[in-house]
Amino acid sequence: MAGKHTQLEELIAPVVESLECELWGLEYSVQGRRSMLRIFIDKQPDGVLVEDCEKVSRQVSSVLDVEDPISGEYTLEVSSPGMDRPLFKLAHFELYVGHRVALRLRVAFEGRRKFQGLLKGIEDGEIVLEVGEEEYLLPFELIDKANVVPQF
């Protein structure tokens, strides 16, 4: 699936950037005979508008129709990352040092797969996460899913 993810990202990123947005990340999944492609875009300085999502959706859809990287039927969703934005890249974690994050790992680390705590920093490609009185160094490559936890 990583190969498909990379292929999709390489097709989609130039389209998103041509519309003056940033490809924050994407999620691709297959369930049965249907595929789901979620594209998260960001835009500085004012954020993403519905019109931005519509433009990106139309343009990406056209590229996908021509290049045909997804066989069969698929659903395409385009949105902003939102307040609970997913963190896809190490650079995303660097932007959110000092914020609370939730992580799910691919495999258990010290007997757990789920963590939620304060993102303290990045050290040698590892996420430094404070959970209560404990501090964990979690290898980035073990992270399956991560997102910012909004504070109200």
From Swiss-Prot:
Tell me which GO cellular component terms the UniProt record holds.
cytosol
Q: Which UniProt keywords apply?
A: Cytoplasm, Ribosome biogenesis
Q: Does the keyword Cytoplasm apply?
A: yes
- In Pfam terms, one family for this protein is DUF150_C
Lineage: superkingdom: Bacteria
PANTHER family documented for this protein: RIBOSOME MATURATION FACTOR RIMP
Primary role: Required for maturation of 30S ribosomal subunits.
The name of this protein is Ribosome maturation factor RimP
What organism does the record attribute this protein to?
Answer: Teredinibacter turnerae (strain ATCC 39867 / T7901)
- Gene this protein is translated from: rimP
